[in-house]
Amino acid sequence: MYKEKDFDIIVVGAGHAGCEAALATAKMGLQTALFTIYLETIAQLSCNPAIGGLAKGHLVREIDALGGIMAKVTDMAGIQFRMLNRSKGPAVWSLRAQADRILYNIYMRKILESTENLAIKQAMVEEIVVENGKVKGIITSLGVFYGAKAVIITPGTFLNGLIHIGLDSFEAGRAGEFPSKKLSESIKKLGLKMGRLKTGTPPRIDAKTIDFSKTEEQGGDDPPIPFSYSTKKINNPQVPCYITYTNEKTHEIILNNLDRSPLYSGKIKGIGPRYCPSIEDKVVKFRDKSRHQIFLEPEGLSRKEYYANGIPTSLPYDVQVAFVRTIPGLEDAEIMRPGYAIEYDFVYPTQIRHTLEVKGIEGLYLAGQINGTSGYEEAAAQGLMAGINAALKIKKQPPLILGRDEAYIGVLIDDLVTKGTQEPYRMFTSRAEFRLLLRHDNADLRLRDYGYKIGLVDEETYEEFNKKKELLQREIKRLKTTTIKPSEELNKALIEAQTTPVEEATFLDKLLKRPELNYDFIKKFAPSEVTLTKELEELVEIHIKYEGYIAKQMELVERMKQFEEKLIPENFDFNIPGLSREVIQKLTEVAPRTIGQAMRIPGVTPAAISILMVAVQKKTTVKK
């Protein structure tokens, strides 16, 4: 075995989790090595060429607020931006961007290669070296040992990856790339319980063979709203997507060929994503639906490939061709790449801590699909937090654990380590109890201070943020302390807006709280002395309009804090008289760090929590 130089931190896998982890640790001043099987596929958009979407957009904004990179690269590579759910309340507004697959890879690699303290290595990592419960480094397929104080594993779908197209299957981590088999064996040897998951991707269509006149064009927002708080302008040309639908003929072909589907023949054992089902699943489970929506998404400005979002499939190639050509606009479609399903190994995430460090193995961190999640954004968020916490531990500083009331990232990680998952986990706004506090628009107000404190947000960015915060507070104060007197012009405008006129001097915030009025109306009659950006105006309006609801959620957060702050001692014995065997087993497996976390474990009843609280109180009293 050949011994190479040591690093502070080694990151294995250069997907979305790995890139965030490596950049975070390097920016925090630690010597970092990022290992990838193939340099050309760094930050590959393996499935759809898009970032964000419902709740996922929140994660990207939070990554940006903490000092991560995904939002900035998306803005550099974005070719269409849309704010989703505008017709609903601001808590569920989410930004989504179509990204140029080639540009995304180019910009991310350029950033990685220009980052100090970061070395990038093309090598197959096969073994994690652990001695006396502490990570020591990794060994590559060439027998090279690299030492490290911490190792972050972010392998995506590569652990024992197996691709299925019809009844044919072959080993791969992604189409055309080697799987990682020995690394999976190494993880199992460490005693970690592993399972099998599955995901899928649709066929890609040659644009020259699509009749777009038979589809519905869907453009983006104009002007486009960037993901990153630092981005001033989107520079790429913006292009549309196109909508079409399956039909009964499509469904008939699929149903007639289920015997050739690896999903329905029993060949695939892994559990697939509930919220991103294959077209086979949709047709079988929703037989009452005569059609399913398809979004034709451009893969990039320099590519003639379209991603057929809505028809992920693992049916044989000939069946894919047959059913695709029944779809309006795709009658003459040529498939450039067939759809496929991929099975891969994952680690049951109740075996990791909130820091994403593996319980019982000091210095080993897991992030991304290995923890049972699906999606680029969920992976990137975990990668960032694993990197931050690995760096903080080496620096002998307290960990950064985000609460469920602070960030969707906090909800994501707490769900994984507390509840675990048996299927690919996807983030939704409905998973957050405090979603009115965790809005897309206020991610920087929630998290920027953390990013600055740990060293991921630079002075200039932080200064700009503080100026924005000051302007926001000043304008809210002005609206709360300034009155407007009745006038003929004002009351005429109020009547036109279908709201009641004012008869006496009224505070501006009271007017703005009216559902019929917006900030533009207030600005017309009582403009601010300082010009606010559109983003700030929106933030002011949301704060004023939802002030009462926000206050109620804050009260609930404060009530819950008593449980979140009630710590359970390390290595606590949950074998408590009065608890059922099932509850003891669940508490022992998860090893919650607080009473609040214990309350969220499925199957742990309120009665069990009462018994646990008494036992914890006794233990802490005895210690004192």
From Swiss-Prot:
Q: Does the keyword Coiled coil apply?
A: no
Q: Name one GO cellular component term.
A: cytosol
> A Gene Ontology biological process annotation?
tRNA wobble uridine modification
Q: Give the Gene Ontology MF terms in alphabetical order.
A: flavin adenine dinucleotide binding
Q: Which UniProt keywords apply?
A: Cytoplasm, FAD, Flavoprotein, NAD, tRNA processing
Q: Does the keyword NAD feature in the UniProt annotation?
A: yes
Q: What are the subcellular locations of this protein? A: Cytoplasm
Would you indicate the residue range of the signal peptide?
none
Q: Which cofactor does it need?
A: FAD
**UniProt-annotated binding residues for FAD:** 13-18, 125, 180, 369
According to its UniProt record, where is this protein mainly located?
cytoplasm
Q: How does it assemble?
A: Homodimer. Heterotetramer of two MnmE and two MnmG subunits.
Question: What role does it play?
Answer: NAD-binding protein involved in the addition of a carboxymethylaminomethyl (cmnm) group at the wobble position (U34) of certain tRNAs, forming tRNA-cmnm(5)s(2)U34.
Q: Which family does it belong to?
A: Belongs to the MnmG family.
UniProt cross-references to NCBIfam families, sorted A to Z: mnmG_gidA (TIGR00136)
This protein's name: tRNA uridine 5-carboxymethylaminomethyl modification enzyme MnmG
Query: Which organism was this protein described from?
Result: Thermodesulfovibrio yellowstonii (strain ATCC 51303 / DSM 11347 / YP87)
Name the encoding gene, please.
mnmG
